[in-house]
A protein has these predicted regions:
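Conserved beta-loop-beta element that borders a ligand/cofactor-binding pocket
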Residues: 82-105
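Conserved catalytic-site region of short-chain dehydrogenase/reductase
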Residues: 19, 55-63, 102-106, 111
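A conserved pocket-lining segment of Rossmann-fold NAD(P)-dependent short-chain dehydrogenase/reductase
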Residues: 117-139, 143
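NAD(P)H-binding glycine-rich loop region in Rossmannoid oxidoreductase-like domains
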Residues: 1-33, 41, 61-63
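Conserved Rossmann-fold NAD(P)-dependent oxidoreductase catalytic core, especially the SDR/UDP-sugar
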Residues: 33-76, 95
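Short-chain dehydrogenase/reductase
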Residues: 26-32, 69-81, 111-115, 134-138
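Glycine-rich Rossmann NAD(P)(H)-binding loop
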Residues: 104, 130-134, 161-168, 178-181, ...
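Mid/C-terminal beta-alpha module of Rossmann-like enzyme folds, strongest
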Residues: 147-213, 230, 243-252
């Protein structure tokens, strides 16, 4: 409560982004419980606005009407979005932002999937790409950050805004990287082989408590297209959709 004293708005962007954890409950504690705690603070502190950062994985895949729950990260992000929507429906000052695949300068970790894949490929540690022809929506982190600021300061007509980017096949990232660096394209891994690898990696992780390289849940996600429409955000938040090629060049300048 002390931290919220004199605060006008809260951005709740914290999340556990991970393929796997030894205890699935940690996803619930952070991804759902963290949001519930932020909402509790807002209710008791007179916060004017709460901006909650969701994920494109909390939305249904392209062409579907139901969200997936392929792994514990996705399951808890779907549930957290429902919690935020319920709060907004009760009249609480909640705005939900739904970024696409975030990329840009930063450490190559699980929250920066594009940076991690490129870094692994550059160092020869990437076995290949699963679902290379599936289209995802790539949102540059700087543009998403600007949208968060706009969501705090602007009067808004809606309670949820999608922050997608250029919709492109996964392999397009590596084609741009090849053109910049001369690095060959990665191999394409069939879904069946990736699922088998995921099962083996899950078994290894259970025995060693070390994170798997891939999981069957991740393969389920990679089977789908995740294209996004950000027109409302462009109009009401002045959201910028950066061309993927110019965005990937910002990665090149930091590697």
């Amino acid at each position: 409560m002390t931290a919220a004293r004199g605060v006008d708005a809260i951005i709740h962007a914290a999340a556990l982004v991970s393929l796997w954890q030894p205890s699935p409950a940690i996803f619930d504690e952070i991804n759902i419980g963290g949001l519930e705690s932020a909402l509790d603070v807002a209710r008791t502190s007179g916060i004017r606005r709460v901006v909650y950062t969701s994920s494109f994985l909390a939305l249904p895949p392209a062409g579907a009407t139901t969200a997936l729950r392929a792994n514990d990260y996705q399951r808890t992000k779907v549930r957290a979005r429902e919690v935020a929507q319920a709060a907004a429906a009760r009249g609480e000052p909640v705005v939900i932002l739904v970024p696409g695949v975030l990329y840009g300068p930063g450490p190559p970790n699980e929250a920066n999937l594009v940076g991690r894949l490129i870094d692994d490929h550059r160092r020869g540690h990437l076995p290949g790409i699963v679902g290379s022809d599936r289209c995802w929506s790539y949102a540059h982190v700087d543009d998403v950050a600007d949208a968060h600021v706009a969501a705090i300061v602007r009067p808004l007509a809606a309670t949820e805004y999608v922050l997608g980017g250029e919709n492109a096949p996964q392999m397009r990232i590596f084609e741009i990287w090849r053109d910049l660096t001369g690095t060959p394209l990665p191999r394409r891994i069939p879904f069946a082989a990736a699922s088998a690898m995921g099962w083996l990696e899950e078994c290894r992780a259970t025995m060693t408590r070390r994170p798997p390289i891939i999981t069957r849940g991740a393969v389920k996600i990679f089977r789908h297209d995740w294209t996004l429409n950000s027109s409302r955000s462009v109009e009401e938040l002045s959201y910028r959709i950066r061309p993927l090629e110019s965005g990937v060049k910002t990665l090149f300048s930091t590697r």
